[in-house]
């Protein structure tokens, strides 16, 4: 039984169980998490997004309370299954956001059905197509699936290592949030199938980034050790409609580390389509990517108490 303030749902589509959180009404926005997470990756963003959007945050296949079948976990396969899930709950056109491995699935969703995606927010994952360095730990997991299973089976240790090594020390999530993440990564079967995402990565249909003609926002943590900022160099050459924001004093898990700043950037990016049409961000010289949101955090009703002071 869920004890939080979110609306939880389950359904089965083509034999695959889906668990998701849904809040709000309006244009749909789909939020996809990465590893080692669940729908809770977006729990700080959902309440504000739900003021204007129908927010859909699923546990991805193999994670949380969704189904964990053995079989094909190639990104293009999971993307097709996610599209079938969206069909089943009546979502045709949508905005989409992904963090970490959620970006991989979102990229593949756009590759399969670009006309269905209105706007795209990618968080903390550069383009694997032209920088193999981005995939070193993915390659290890894919080549050592049994060892990856053993590591993930100890959810408490696995999650803590990921967050302690990936967040900027002074911006790490608190103990209560870490325990929530551990709980969601502790469901039976997760450690057996999540490594298959890595093992099957080469089985996926190649992504054609020329299909990414919708507006795209890239959000990057300033001190992300998993995806150093230099990995983003040249991304705008592959995605012509790209805008970007650098989240200061944050590591890899920006939705937890700097929740107000991420929510603010997402709302401004999405709202620009609904209203103003003004330039989204001030430009900087940092790899040609823009870095500064033009609206205050309070503009979207976000609790300023969770916004930490920016450095410098």
Where are each of the predicted segments found?
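Conserved HGGG/HGGXW glycine-rich cap/lid loop of the alpha/beta-hydrolase fold
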Residues: 16-65, 226
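Conserved residues in the N-terminal Rossmann fold of short-chain dehydrogenase/reductase
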Residues: 10, 57, 246-247
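Catalytic active-site module of serine/aspartate enzymes centered on a nucleophile-bearing elbow/loop
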Residues: 242-312
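Generic recognition of short, well-ordered alpha-helical segments
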Residues: 40, 44, 230, 257-260
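Flexible "cap/lid" subdomain of the alpha/beta-hydrolase fold that forms the substrate-access gate
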Residues: 2-6, 18, 28, 63-65, ...
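A short, glycine- and basic residue-enriched loop/turn
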Residues: 38-39, 104, 250-251
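Short acidic-hydrophobic surface loop/beta-edge motif
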Residues: 7-13
């Amino acid at each position: 039984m869920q004890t939080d303030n979110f609306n939880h749902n389950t359904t089965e589509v083509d034999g695959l169980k889906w668990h998701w959180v849904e809040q709000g009404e309006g244009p749909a926005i789909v939020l996809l998490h990465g590893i080692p997470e669940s729908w809770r990756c977006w729990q700080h963003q959902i309440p504000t997004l739900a003021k204007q959007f129908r927010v859909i945050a699923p546990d991805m296949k193999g994670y949380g309370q969704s189904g964990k079948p053995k079989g094909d976990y190639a990104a293009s396969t999971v993307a097709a299954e996610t599209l079938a899930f969206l069909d089943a709950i009546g979502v045709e056109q949508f905005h989409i956001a992904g963090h970490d491995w959620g970006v991989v699935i979102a990229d593949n969703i756009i590759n399969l059905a670009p006309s269905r995606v209105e706007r795209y927010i990618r968080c903390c994952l550069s383009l694997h197509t032209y920088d193999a360095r981005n995939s070193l730990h993915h390659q290890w997991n894919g080549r050592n699936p049994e060892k990856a299973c053993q590591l993930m089976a100890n959810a408490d240790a696995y999650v803590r290592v990921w967050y302690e090594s990936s967040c900027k020390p002074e911006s790490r999530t608190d103990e209560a949030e870490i325990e929530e993440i551990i709980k969601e990564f502790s469901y039976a079967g997760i450690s057996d199938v999540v490594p298959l995402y890595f093992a099957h990565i080469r089985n996926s249909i190649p992504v054609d980034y020329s299909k990414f003609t919708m507006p795209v926002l890239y959000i990057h943590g300033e001190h992300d050790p998993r995806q150093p900022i230099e990995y983003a160099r040249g991304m705008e050459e592959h995605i012509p409609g790209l805008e970007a924001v650098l989240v200061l004093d944050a590591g890899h898990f920006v939705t937890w580390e700097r929740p107000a700043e991420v929510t603010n950037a997402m709302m401004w990016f999405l709202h620009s389509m609904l209203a103003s049409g003004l330039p989204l961000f001030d430009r900087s010289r940092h790899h040609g990517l823009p870095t500064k949101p033009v609206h205050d955090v309070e503009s979207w009703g976000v609790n300023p108490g969770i916004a930490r002071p920016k450095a410098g």
